[in-house]
């Protein structure tokens, strides 16, 4: 194989890897993993803050 052909194959492999990794971290409903994690963390923070009077006074919008 020539240098040009090897470079073309390299680019195709990089493109295929990028497409696979980009689509594999998406959830079926369209939300990605970071958005799901944030959705799980938020109620936990609210629950912890609302039980602490000092935090509740600082963040009344959470409780």
Curated annotation (Swiss-Prot):
Establish whether keyword Signal is in the entry.
yes
Excised during maturation, the propeptide residues are 22-47
Intracellular or extracellular location(s): Secreted
Per the record, which residues fall in region Ser-Xaa-Pro motif, crucial for potent interaction with nAChR?
Answer: 51-53
Bilayer-spanning residue ranges: none
Give a GO cellular-component term. Answer: extracellular region
- Family membership: Belongs to the conotoxin A superfamily.
What further fact does the record state?
Negative results: shows a very weak inhibition of tetrodotoxin (TTX)-resistant sodium channels. Does not show activity at TTX-sensitive sodium channels, L- or T-type calcium channels, opioid receptors, TRPV1 and KCNQ1 channels. In vivo, does not exhibit any significant side-effects for spontaneous locomotor activity, cardiac and respiratory function and drug dependence.
This chain's function reads: This amidated peptide potently and teversibly inhibits Cav2.2/CACNA1B. Steady-state inactivation is enhanced at hyperpolarized membrane potentials. Also shows a weak interaction at alpha-3-beta-4/ CHRNA3-CHRNB4 and alpha-7/CHRNA7 nAChRs subtypes. In vivo, exhibits a potent analgesic activity in rat partial sciatic nerve injury and chronic constriction injury models.
Protein name in the entry = Omega-conotoxin Eu1.6
Q: Which organism is it from?
A: Conus eburneus
């Amino acid at each position: 194989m020539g240098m040009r052909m090897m470079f073309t194959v390299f680019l195709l492999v990089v493109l295929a890897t990028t497409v696979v990794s980009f689509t594999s971290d998406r959830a079926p409903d369209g939300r990605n993993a970071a958005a799901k994690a944030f959705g799980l963390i938020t109620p936990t923070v609210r629950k912890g803050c609302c039980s602490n009077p000092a935090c509740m006074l600082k963040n009344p919008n959470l409780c």
